[in-house]
Amino acid sequence: MTAPWQPLLDWWFGSSGSASEVAAQKGRLWFGKRDSQDLEARERFGDWVEQALAGGLTEWMQRPEGWLALVLLLDQLPRMIFRDSPKAFSGDIRAQTLVAQGIAADFDRQLQPIQRVFIYLVFEHSENLAVQNEGVSRYIELVAQQPESDRALFSDY
């Protein structure tokens, strides 16, 4: 049986591939601004975003992939669905809390490196300099762990 969060992870990261293949395929989704992408995010995942923002979907925290999906629902998707509105950032505090909890459980180490980018990015979105520095430190460590051939890709994030 497919995990409930799998459609979100497939949409965000694709179904497979190396970090460079995933980034080439999904980079515009991640870092582009397109009304069509924002609409697709709202139509496909808007209900989940609202549930996550309301404190729901906590059962997803039991597995690293579910944790990642929940973090995306709180941090990345609101920035698309509620673009140019304060609600775009309404999941940031909960996302930071969940990221800290997941890191304490070593969930980040169980994800693919390209997935970990979006975990550490949550800390970089913080208004708190100490939290930002934590994200930067973890990201520097992630880059250093990559094969030489992937370091340039990861250095761009």
What are these regions (language model features)?
Residues M1-D84, F89-Y157:
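Intrinsically disordered, low-complexity activation-like regions
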